[in-house]
Amino acid sequence: MKFSAPVLAIFLASASAQSTAELAAQIPSCAQTCLATAITGAGCTAGDYACQCGTSQNTITASATPCVISACTSEEALNTQRTTSQICALVAAGSASSPSASSSASASASSSASSTSGAASASASASSSASSASAAASALTLAHPIPNPSHPPSPTIQTNLRKKVRNSNRLTPASLSSVSSALVSSASSVRASASSAVSAATTAANPAATTAAGVKEEASFFIPAAVALFAVFAV
């Protein structure tokens, strides 16, 4: 069993007010020793109700509760809880009528107002931060939009992709070098054949010279054609 009242620890040997004395008389005898020990341990005296119901209240309650539970019946423990609560209520009512108590109440109200204001400011700051984060996320999405599969690339992008594919299918530098070497070799062979034919034509009859001239013309035609073919492959 655990007490929920603010005070379980008031032991009254004497009282300065009749109402407080009447309440003190209602505390079960089984709880008085427990309360007296807890009050002394907290640094208060038996008749110092301001101390017992003030800053030492939690200490007295924590110390007296286990003792009261073990020493009293459930009914007696409940009566102790109810009576000590009423005594502290009378102490609080008497303190509230003094100027110092009014000052304390005002300070407490001011502190509560400050706490409320601080909480409101923190809430506004958090809301502002959330708005800023949302705006930043929107700006990032606009600057770097996520591709949408339902919207195909624009015609310009498709054209660029086709160019890249077409360029990738062209001859590589190694292939172009091989083709160039083959064309040069073929041209050299034709040129050598033409030269041999011309030399033979100078010592042979006119029909042979005519044949050599024809071979030379074929060689002259083949070489430019080979160069043109090489240019086509190089594109």
Curated annotation (Swiss-Prot):
InterPro entries: Extracellular_membr_CFEM_dom (IPR008427). Appears to function during host infection, and may play a role in suppressing the host immune response. It is a lipid-anchor; GPI-anchor. Disulfide bonds join C30-C72, C34-C67, C44-C51, C53-C88. Heme binds at D48. It is found in: Cell membrane; Secreted; Host cytoplasm; Host nucleus. This is Effector CFEM1. PROSITE patterns: CFEM. One of its GO terms (biological process) is biological process involved in interaction with host. One of its GO terms (cellular component) is host cell cytoplasm. Keywords: Cell membrane, Disulfide bond, Glycoprotein, GPI-anchor, Heme, Host cell membrane, Host cytoplasm, Host membrane, Host nucleus, Iron, Lipoprotein, Membrane, Metal-binding, Secreted, Signal, Virulence. Belongs to the RBT5 family. A lipid is attached at T211 (GPI-anchor amidated threonine). It comes from Marssonina brunnea f. sp. multigermtubi (strain MB_m1) (Marssonina leaf spot fungus). Its main location: membrane. Residues 212-235 form a propeptide. Residues 18-114 form the CFEM domain. GO terms for molecular function: metal ion binding. It comes from the Eukaryota.
